[in-house]
Amino acid sequence: RGDEVLTFVNRNLEPYRGYHVFMRALPDILAARPKAQVVIVGEDGVSYGKRPEAGGKWKDIFLNEVKDRLDLSRVHFTGRLPYDRLVDLMHVSRAHAYLTYPFVLSWSMVETLAAGTLVVGSNTAPVAEVIKDGVNGRLVDFFDIKGWSDTLTDALARPEAYVQMRQNARDMTRAKYDLRSVCLPQQIALLTRLERS
């Protein structure tokens, strides 16, 4: 985590998962952190919301909105990554932005916490159930673009200030979401109860 790598991951880059908010925060982040590199993972389709009414793709619409204020040589769109490469990316990421409307939490956020990456998440129901602000990550109001810029800039600038939060995130993930010791036994117990009833 020696490099200032900021990540954003979604199946598809669309408003439902906060792509528009993240892109609007990027110009100030990159202006404040001239060595930062941004890796954006996701395809340009739609998974949860609807397609743009005027046509086109959400990825391009929100990139075009801010591209004149970005150094595009520092913004890297990867498309979809296989699981192992995504996990590798989380291990080099200094900070990860995770936004979602109140909806199902993505498995990738849990994987990111498990990797010990600082997650700055939207203060929405599914995220706030997992991240406790200042304890195992940071929370920012979904539409607070300045809050996103400031919080992500600080995370890139002062990684030492977040060491304990990253460790707490790893510990919490292992304690609550480990497949072998927690999730699988709970699923088996649930199926056993259902079978008996």
Predicted segments with their positions:
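C-terminal alpha-helical cap of glycosyltransferases
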Residues: 158, 179-197
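Conserved donor-binding/catalytic core segment of Leloir-type glycosyltransferases
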Residues: 1-17, 23-28, 39-41
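Nucleotide-activated donor-binding/catalytic signature segment of Leloir-type glycosyltransferases, i.e.
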Residues: 45-46, 51-80
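Short alpha-helical segment that forms part of, or immediately flanks, the ligand-binding pocket
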Residues: 87, 106-114, 128-129, 135
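Conserved acidic donor-binding segment of nucleotide-sugar-dependent glycosyltransferases
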Residues: 133-134, 138-145, 154-159
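Acidic donor-binding loop of glycosyltransferase active sites
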Residues: 8, 91-104, 117
